[in-house]
Amino acid sequence: MERNDSLKRVLSCLADRNLGGALTELRNFFALYSQPQAEAELEPLLAEYQMMSNYWKRGYKDPQLEANFNRLLQRTCQLYADTSRWRRIMASPFMSTVYSSLAQQPREWSVANIRQELEAYVSDVAMVSLEPANKQKTHLQELNTRHLKSMSQLFDYLWTSRHWSDATAQAFEEMLLSPTVDATDQQLMISAMTLSLLNTFDMAKFRVLVHVYRQALVEAVRQRALVGWVMGRSYTMTIVFPEEQQLVNEMMEDEAIRRELLELQIQFLYTVNAESDTAKIQSEIMPDLLKNNHFRITRNGVEEVEEDSLEDILHPEADEERMERVEESFRKMIDMQKEGSDIYFGGFSQMKRFPFFHRMCNWFMPFSMTHPEVTETLSTIQHNRFLQQVLRKGPFCNSDKYSFVFAFSQVLERMPQSMRDLMEQGEAAIEVVDDEESVTPTYVRRMYLQDLYRFFRLFAHTSQFDHPFKTGESELGQVLFFASPLFRNTKLELYYDKLGTMLLRRKRYEDLRTLMKNQGESHRTYSYYMLAATAIRNTKEPMDSKVRLEGILENYRNALNLNPFAEKAMQGEARILLEMERYEEAIATYDHLIAINPDKQSYVLNRAVCLESLERYEEALKPLFRLNYEQPDDVNVSRVLAWTLLGVGKYEQALTLYEKLTTVEQAAAEDFLNQGYCMWLTGNVQGAIESFRHYIKETGEPAINIINNEERMLSKKGISNEEMQMMYDAIAP
């Protein structure tokens, strides 16, 4: 999507409420790219700003200054939006072709005329139903063909439209809520408005979508409006149009809306995973289905096809095992779909090259068997019971149903007769969606999101639009709309914990941190602080290690302020204190943890690590001996005990443990290192050299670190600097 540096500077000024700067940058832009109509709109804005500025400079106190300034700022923003739109149209062959085609139409684009045409269509359809049966089909086809052409033009007009006046917005809102306008037409208009908002924010269109969402009685219309205002929300213009924030704040007082937004956010996450889900199906599920394809699918499920009996004699259990694997593969896919995965994207993405999808509005068209561009195709196959079942009850989005019609018509004649008979009789089994579920808000919204995702991923000219499903390598970006500043300090934050838990389960730590950073202090709960600590610990954001650890510790302590006896938070605090080498504080926390759960081995062991780090070896030995007695084969206990024994000078006992640790399968390199120290202190220099070399070979650690890391301990144990240098010379590669 084309962007212009001059217009970026205008946008930056507007985001800073720098009205004078925005007007100046617009004037500079028009000096480079002449646009007479827009320049004519700029002149009165410049004049009004100059007049306002002159009065202010003379010391006049205008009680209307703030209101006038804000109105002028909004008008300037609208001019910027229209100019940005014009610039994109001129820079895009696709958009300029659409725009030129609309300009050549003799059609009047007034709202009154549009509404009259839409209502006339509904009336005409009703009249056709009163005609003789032998005429109805032809007349309805002619009527639908004209209407499709009209709606296609209206769709293009809306997504390329300028900003709306309040009067225009009000008229469109009434049209979108009117029972005298066909719901399919209303849905198409909302989709076109969404595309327009994605390219350039328009407060009037945003307001219309919010109002339609809150007032529409047709669920499909309502859900498209919801998706539309969420996708089309502004990231920068709230400071210019505070009404946007006011509308959002009002909605966030409604618990039902908050719940619906949480559902939508989760559905967004599943939607953008369509391609990874496809990859999972192809790599993990389809191989089993293809490998075990000695079955057919009927209305009764998976049934066996007769095979050569020799295999049955040699391997009587093989068929049953194959059946189980096939059924398990199907269950995996069904489970993925029930969770919200778009499991059909991979297959249907190959079916979007039909001429039907050259018409842009068809990507958003609710499925209808009377669509004039599918009626001819359906005329020869519409009585196929399998097809009827797919189109009426199949779990497919509208776009995929249209794809299925065209693909099915091409392959039907090439199918084996036995398979065609099965389909004609309606015995080929597919997963069906019951009527009750198909009209639920959740299902309606999911299908629409799949339609949108297919458009933005597969439409030939999708680069002309801001991609609402675009994600980074490790971040969801704008897909994570819960992290939008619009929702900060609103009651939507009451649902951040639920979403955060889901992000945590999916190991989306960067996104979890982004979400947590957006949450205001008033709604921060125990769960918030625990999630925030986990996010910081697992993100790769470059920051000073000490600052990072302090941030984690602060979150754990904030969690404990809200729930002083929370073992998880206390455990996190102790672990971070240990990592920060604040051993005294860590010991105090582990004392509390052991009081809560005295049988938890990790608490006792980590407390002992703190004690030995403080060189309080004797104090650490007693609990370590107990643990070693109870768990003689636990390598972690043996490892800590061995180092503690080394600390108190009981080298032989330590060596016994290190001998055991270094002879187990897949011995840890660290144990060879510590064994080397122990051997050195007992005078077995050659053994120490061999252990150190083994450690260096395994880890690539510089030889000098072996000396430097434990220089203090070695000196206290009587190893001289000269001996240390000689050891370095002996082990250095």
Name these PLM-found stretches:
Residues 16, 506, 539-540, 546, ...:
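Structural motif corresponding to the intra-repeat A-B loop/turn of tetratricopeptide repeats
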Residues 518-519, 558-559, 592-593, 626-627, ...:
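Canonical positions in the second alpha-helix
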Residues 224, 494, 527, 568, ...:
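Start-of-helix register in tetratricopeptide repeats
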Residues 365-568, 572-575:
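Alpha-solenoid helical-repeat scaffolds
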Residues 34, 523-524, 564, 598, ...:
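Short coil turns that delineate tetratricopeptide repeat
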